C-alpha cells in the first residue's frame, strides 16, 4: 500500500504470512493515516500480529501515535500485537513522553475467554 500523494514519502506494509507484516519507508506525519487505513484491512483476520520495522527509513511522533493506536485496536479486538526493531527515533520519543512501557502492552495474549467444556455427566 502506498499513500496517494506523490509528494509524501512512500511506505509499504507487506503481509509476510502467519500474521507477520513488514513496514518499510516513512512512518510519520506524511504516511500514518494511510498506513492505518491499510492496516485495518490487513490485520483484521489475524489473532496474533508481528510487525517488523527494520526497513523504516523515517519516523516521528505520528509514527509513535500509530503504534499506540495499533495497541489500542489490538486490545479492543482482543488481539496480540508485537513490534520488532522499532525505529530509534520512536523509542526516544516514547521514553521522553514516558510511554515506553505502552509499546509492549499488546504483547500479552488478550484473546476471548473460552467457555468451559460441557460436562460429560448425564442430565435428568
Indicate where each model-derived feature is located.
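STAS-like cytosolic regulatory interaction modules
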Residues: 1-59, 69-124
